[in-house]
Amino acid sequence: MRRIAVVGAAGRMGKNLIEAVQQTGGAAGLTAAVDRPDSTLVGADAGELAGLGRIGVPLSGDLGKVCEEFDVLIDFTHPSVTLKNIEQCRKARRAMVIGTTGFSADEKLLLAEAAKDIPIVFAANFSVGVNLCLKLLDTAARVLGDEVDIEIIEAHHRHKVDAPSGTALRMGEVVAQALGRDLREVAVYGREGQTGARARETIGFATVRAGDVVGDHTVLFAAEGERVEITHKASSRMTFARGAVRAALWLEGKESGLYDMQDVLGLR
């Protein structure tokens, strides 16, 4: 049995992750759950927090105290928290699955450095469908080339704090790489006022934050007379949770290195 820990266990995504671990039919088991040290829920049973009933795993406020109790840590929290957790796992030689978004370029370098010592799966989105879309986007960009205008539209719930979403940015990176462009140079984030004619090489991003939208992403390839749209819509966070647990199982026996869901799904 793969021993899995969830950090941010008292949050919405944390509860979904706990449920996904417990749905593996014995292939994995939740052996540690961690949240903020000042949480009033520390000591509560993680299964009860997730609505699953008692499973005998108390919520801890200190990752360092439970590092011997798991093989892989799943982290969907905040960059500042994740970076601290990476150092803990690095010292304890524990694998990680990271779904946190909003990292700066420098922070991503720190993550890559840690992956020299431990195996890490890091992805902007753990949905199988989204990762299939990334493969399709690479193909579409290579086929349609410079003959189309490319726009990326994403929508999420009102509580999401980063924009554009990590998934939208990853989609932009895939398209830009396929076309030999640097996303940092061609991305346009929102438009307002007299913007002038659209430059063909740009990749536009539009962001919506409203209600309880779990996650919608559309990449539009628009040419004269036709357009191609590649869309993914998530209706439940469980799709991300199940993907993360799948990644945790896949990591067993893997050497140190930085992997993503394309590796997990065999899409490379």
From Swiss-Prot:
PROSITE patterns: DAPB. Belongs to the DapB family. It comes from Pseudomonas paraeruginosa (strain DSM 24068 / PA7) (Pseudomonas aeruginosa (strain PA7)). NAD(+) binds at G8, A9, A10, G11, R12, M13, D35, G99, T100, T101, A123, A124, N125, F126. NADP(+) binds at R36. Pathway: Amino-acid biosynthesis; L-lysine biosynthesis via DAP pathway; (S)-tetrahydrodipicolinate from L-aspartate: step 4/4. (S)-2,3,4,5-tetrahydrodipicolinate binds at H157, G166, T167. The keyword NAD applies. Gene3D superfamilies: Dihydrodipicolinate Reductase, domain 2, NAD(P)-binding Rossmann-like Domain. InterPro entries: DapB_C, DapB_N, DapB_N_CS, DHDPR_bac, NAD(P)-bd_dom_sf. GO terms for biological process: diaminopimelate biosynthetic process; lysine biosynthetic process via diaminopimelate. Its EC number is 1.17.1.8. Catalyzes the conversion of 4-hydroxy-tetrahydrodipicolinate (HTPA) to tetrahydrodipicolinate. Keywords: Amino-acid biosynthesis, Cytoplasm, Diaminopimelate biosynthesis, Lysine biosynthesis, NAD, NADP, Oxidoreductase. It is found in: Cytoplasm. This is 4-hydroxy-tetrahydrodipicolinate reductase. The keyword NADP applies. NCBIfam families: dapB (TIGR00036). One of its GO terms (molecular function) is NAD binding. It is an enzyme of class 1 (oxidoreductase). The active site is at H156 (proton donor/acceptor), K160 (proton donor). Pfam families: DapB_C (PF05173), DapB_N (PF01113). SUPFAM superfamilies: Glyceraldehyde-3-phosphate dehydrogenase-like, C-terminal domain, NAD(P)-binding Rossmann-fold domains.
